Structures are given as structure tokens and as C-alpha cells.
Regions:
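Cytochrome P450 proximal C-terminal region
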Residues: 3, 37, 126, 130, ...
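Conserved cytochrome P450 K-helix/beta-meander segment immediately N-terminal to the heme-binding cysteine loop
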Residues: 354-381
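Cytochrome P450 catalytic-domain helical core, especially the substrate-recognition surface
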Residues: 2-35, 39, 51-53, 61-64, ...
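Conserved cytochrome P450 K-helix E-x-x-R motif and the immediately C-terminal K′/meander segment
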Residues: 21-41, 215, 301-342
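Conserved cytochrome P450 catalytic core segment spanning the I/J/K helices
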Residues: 21, 111, 209-273, 287, ...
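Cytochrome P450 catalytic-core helices
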Residues: 268-293, 404-419
Length: 456
């Protein structure tokens, strides 16, 4: 299907009256959106929910216009941001001056240069976290994938987030709290037009988890105020900025940004690494090639940062993983001024949604899009992709600043586990996606790790 990507407002969006199939949409919104996206074939879509009629842009040219070319017109605002604004406040997850200030303060912590300086300590943390998998592996015990990936990610990123300024008991409270926030916000995220006065499933659990998270984070801020310290971690950068940037920054601002970075640094990586194991289980040829590359480069050693540049297939596997299961599955924007997208007039105040998950599965953009094929990201083929055919970290000024940490961490964790074990996933065929703040497997997933070498 040819798609008009011009800017002359002469067309109408493809309309889908979701209010007619609302119960089906609520039961499985991801499947409904996939169906709609496939039928539209890249045309701009109007989702008619009755109370709300947002547009949905999936064609790479339309996405590029919204996220990059007209990023100053399409802003983070409107009802689709209400659940996140209530959670993250005036942080890097916001817009305008609040976002610019937070980004300016946090950007140095996530620079490529600084991330490289952290690689040795992160590799040590990953190897130590993977060490604890040896006991259940040699005992033949199954592990729950998502909690174990969360534990490994948490133990890796905690130094980047807090340096040495957090106690183990405090860190242990934050992990389940973030897990509960991520799962309980799902209905508010999907149904943002429902007033807060009308209770939805998850509201009570969300409030309890948020209260616990806030209590812990404010304790950390209070302690830093009483005994300031040095460091190049996120927490220190925020606390020092609060003291030097003026009276406009308070404890609430520090808390908002801490919670934002906690969610983006841990939740997204955990979920992505949860998906990789059922995918590899269903694609033994990919798993075999991965193991061969890792064995040739790493052998029986502990994984080090210098190994990664010699593991190109590991990088391709992570890239293809993010094509099928991007860390951010949808990005809402609202138009400040009239414009047009794909020839469709957009009024000021209209909401336009862009979805990496849906763009990454368009047949007009990707050949056989549901097939897991890391060769799509070989050097020869990767350069042929449209810039916005693949945008798992968003795009334009709001592209995720933590993407370098994610890539390094994900590649190291995958390599470390596969250098020691052969994972066997139980019921990998049951790994069905469910959307909320991120795209998680609907059902609990377990796997057994078969040791590649005998216990020492």
C-alpha cells in the first residue's frame, strides 16, 4: 500500500470506532491495536473511543514529523500524560522548562564517556549477580525469570542511581515498590479519560506502593541534606542541583527525577531481558549462534567490557529484541498549533500517539515483521532502514538519555548468563504480551539453567 506522507491537508484519517468493541479492547488492547495498525497499513489512524478521539501515527515519516521535525509543536501534554505526571511530576518525564532543566542536570551522568567509566564496576556487579544463579542451576531448580532479571538489573544499576548513599534495606524496599507501580498503573494508562473519582483496578495497590516509595526516597533526601557527599551518580547530581540552582528546586523535584530515572533504568531493562529467554527458546538457531560467538570470545572467563566490541551478534540480538518488544511501546503527544500529518489536518489540542511497537511490526516497513531475525541489524542491512522505522528509545529531543546504559547492561547480562548456562524455558509458547506502562509477559515465566561447566 502506498502512503501519502505529504503535509498538504487533503486527506482523512482511517477511522476505527473502538467504542463499538470497547469490551474487547479493554480485554486485549494490544491485539486490537495490532489489528487496526495492520489494516491501516501506515495510514494515519483516528481511534474513536467516544470520549476521546486520538490519532495514531505508525508510518516512519509520520513518526519522524511528530517526534523530531515538529517536536516543538507536538509536546508531552494532555490526558494521556496524566497518569505519568501524577507519578513523576516535574521531572525529565515532563515537558518545557521542567524537562529542559532536568535533562541539563542529568545528561552528563548518562554521557557515553561517563557510562564507559562505569563499565568495570557494572561488569563486576553483573558477574556477582549472575554468580547467585549457580546454586539453583546446579540443583536443577527453576527460577522465575522476571524477578531474577529484576534482581540482576537492580544490583547493576543501583550504583549509577545512588552511588554509596543508599542502604541495602532501602534498596530492597524500592524494588518491589517499583514492580507494583509498573503493574498497577496499567488501567489508568490505557483509560486516561476516566476521572480519578471513578476507581479502576489497581488504584489502591498503586497508592500503597507510591506511599512506600515516597517514604524511602524522602528519607534519602533528608539524610543527604544532613550529611552531603560527593559522587557522580544521579542522586548526588540531583541533590547538588537542588542546592545550587535556586529556590525553585525542592525535595519534591529531587524525588520526581529519582522516581523517573528508577523506572526508566530498571523497569525497562528488566522487562526487555525477560522477553529474550522465551524468544531464544523458540529460536534455537539464534541461541546456538549466540553461544558459539560468546564461547569463542569469552570462553570460561568472566565477562568484561572489552569483550563486547568482539560480540557483534549479541548486539544484533538485543536490537532485534527491542524491535519486537521496545522499552517504550507508545509515546503520546498533543499538538499546540494546527498542522497536518500525512495530509490529514491536525487541530491545536489534538492528541497524536506514536507507537514503536506498532511501527516495528508494519509489513510495509519490515519484511516478515513477526519473525525474530537479528540479521536485520547486520551492518549491511541496518543502514537501509528508515531512521524512524526503528525507534525503541523514542526520538528527537526526548530520546531516552539512558539508552547507553541499557545497551551496555543488556549485552553484558545476556553474555554473562549464556557464557555459563544453557537456559531451558518452561512453556515458552505461553509468553503472550500484555500492555501497561511497559509490555510484559501476561503469564509468569520460569526457566531452568543447565550449567555449561561443573561447579568449582
Amino acid at each position: 500500500m502506498s502512503v501519502d506522507v505529504g503535509s498538504v491537508p487533503t486527506r482523512k484519517a482511517v477511522s476505527f470506532p473502538l467504542y463499538r468493541t470497547f469490551s474487547r479492547f479493554v480485554r486485549d488492547p494490544l491485539r486490537e491495536l495490532e489489528r487496526i495498525s495492520a489494516e491501516a497499513g501506515g495510514e494515519l489512524i483516528r481511534l474513536d473511543l467516544g470520549a476521546s478521539r486520538p490519532y495514531l501515527a505508525t508510518h516512519p515519516d509520520h513518526v519522524q514529523q511528530v517526534l523530531r521535525r515538529e517536536s516543538q509543536n507536538f509536546v508531552r501534554d494532555g490526558m494521556f500524560w496524566r497518569p505519568l505526571r501524577g507519578l513523576f511530576g516535574a521531572s525529565i518525564m515532563s515537558e518545557f522548562d521542567e524537562w529542559e532543566l532536568s535533562k541539563r542536570i542529568l545528561q552528563p551522568v548518562f554521557s557515553t564517556k561517563h557510562v564507559r567509566a562505569l563499565t568495570e564496576s557494572m561488569a563486576d556487579a553483573i558477574n556477582a549477580a549472575v554468580d547467585t544463579l549457580e546454586a539453583p542451576a546446579h540443583a536443577g531448580e527453576a527460577i522465575e525469570i522476571l524477578p531474577e532479571m529484576g534482581r540482576i538489573v537492580h544490583e547493576t544499576v543501583i550504583k549509577v542511581l545512588f552511588g554509596n548513599k543508599i542502604r541495602q534495606a532501602e534498596a530492597d524496599r524500592l524494588v518491589p515498590g517499583m514492580e507494583k507501580l509498573a503493574t498497577s498503573i496499567a488501567y489508568r494508562f490505557l483509560l486516561p479519560f476516566v476521572p480519578r473519582s471513578i476507581p479502576l483496578p489497581g488504584d489502591r495497590a498503586f497508592a500503597a506502593a507510591l506511599e512506600m516509595m515516597d517514604e524511602t526516597l524522602y528519607e534519602l533526601v533528608d539524610r543527604y541534606r544532613d550529611a552531603p557527599g560527593e559522587g557522580f551518580d544521579i542522586f548526588t547530581a540531583l541533590c547538588q542541583a537542588r542546592m545550587t540552582e535556586g529556590s525553585g528546586l525542592d525535595d519534591q523535584w529531587v524525588r520526581d527525577n529519582l522516581l523517573s530515572m528508577w523506572a526508566t533504568s530498571i523497569e525497562t531493562t528488566t522487562v526487555a531481558l525477560t522477553w529474550i529467554w522465551p524468544i531464544l527458546d523458540r529460536h534455537p538457531e539464534v541461541a546456538g549462534r549466540l553461544r558459539k560467538e560468546i564461547d569463542e570470545v569469552v570462553g570460561g572467563e568472566r565477562v568484561r567490557p572489552e569483550h563486547l566490541h568482539r560480540l557483534p551478534y549479541v548486539k544484533q540480538v538485543i536490537q532485534e529484541l527491542l524491535r519486537l518488544y521496545p522499552v517504550g511501546w507508545i509515546f503520546p503527544r498533543i499538538a499546540q498549533n494546527p498542522t497536518s500529518v500525512g495530509g490529514v489536518p491536525i487541530k491545536a489540542g489534538d492528541t497524536v500517539l506514536v507507537s514503536p511497537y506498532l511501527t516495528h511490526r508494519l509489513e510495509s516497513v519490515w519484511e516478515d515483521p513477526l519473525r525474530f531475525d537479528p540479521e536485520r541489524f547486520s551492518p549491511e542491512r541496518a543502514r537501509t532502514h528508515h531512521r524512524y522505522a526503528y525507534y525503541p528509545f523514542g526520538g528527537g529531543p526526548h530520546m531516552c538519555i539512558g539508552r547507553h546504559v541499557f545497551n551496555f547492561e543488556a549485552e553484558l547480562i545476556l553474555t554473562s548468563i549464556l557464557s555459563r548456562f544453557r537456559p531451558e524455558v518452561r512453556h515458552a509458547e505461553g509468553a503472550i504480551p500484555k500492555i501497561g506502562a511497559t509490555i510484559r509477559p501476561r503469564n509468569e515465566l520460569k526457566m531452568t539453567l543447565v550449567p555449561l561447566r561443573s561447579a568449582a
